[in-house]
Regions:
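Short, contiguous alpha-helical
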Residues: 1-13, 17, 54-100, 139-180
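Small-residue-biased structural context
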Residues: 2-6, 24, 33, 47, ...
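Acidic/His metal-coordination segments adjacent to aromatic residues that form catalytic metal sites
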Residues: 23, 101-114, 146-155
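A generic "alpha-helical surface" signal
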Residues: 28, 32-35, 65, 69, ...
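A short secondary-structure junction motif
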Residues: 44, 48-51, 89, 133-136, ...
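Short, contiguous, helix-prone interaction/anchoring segments in small proteins
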Residues: 22-58
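Acidic/histidine-rich alpha-helical segments that form the ligand environment
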Residues: 32-39, 44, 102-139
């Protein structure tokens, strides 16, 4: 049985729901969300102190620090997957264990500035490349080995726009609950 309170903390903007159609307008909006994520994230976290950064967004959840570093880790994987899909014929991508990565020392204790800077450059490149894609490029794909599922680039764009906003909401909702 699901716990609605826990689900609201885990998925503050809801679980990802793919659109019925990946229209040009949807893709443009998703790329805009990706392009603006680093600045929106920075505005929410830049003035937090160490204790706040080390506060989990929910019981047994990641800390704000871990969420920020996870976004860097995850979105680097997105960038590589995008490049593979554009340059190879339906490649099988490498799966990574995000929970294990989140427990590495850099994700646990490193200052957030390097990841904020990484996200700034990475998202510029993501948005730049994504904006250059034509309809045929958006249909190119890769295989994700976790569920042996083929994922098209247009789906990747929608998913990572959601992923950015999903983790940003973890932070903004925690700040609201704590009155920060």
């Amino acid at each position: 049985m699901e716990n609605p309170e826990l689900e609201k903390l885990q998925y503050p903007i809801g679980k990802y729901t793919a659109p019925d159609e990946y229209s040009a307008e949807f893709i443009k909006g998703a790329i805009y969300q990706i392009a603006t994520f680093p600045e929106r994230l920075k505005q929410e976290v830049i003035y937090l102190n160490e204790e706040q950064l080390d506060t989990p967004y929910r019981k047994e959840g990641w800390t704000i620090r871990q969420v920020i570093h996870h976004c860097g880790d995850s979105h680097m994987n997105c960038y590589i997957r995008l490049k593979w899909a554009l340059t190879e014929e339906i490649p099988i991508i490498k799966y990574y264990y995000e929970d294990r990565w989140s427990r590495l020392e850099d994700n646990l204790t490193m200052p957030i500035t390097p990841s904020l800077l990484l996200l700034e450059g990475l998202h510029y490149r993501l948005a730049y490349l994504m904006s250059s894609l034509n309809a045929n490029d958006l249909k190119k794909s890769f295989i994700h080995p976790e569920h042996n599922k083929e994922i098209q680039i247009k789906e990747l764009i929608g998913l990572y726009a959601w992923h950015s906003n999903h983790h940003l909401a973890h932070i903004t909702e925690l700040k609201k609950r704590k009155g920060w």
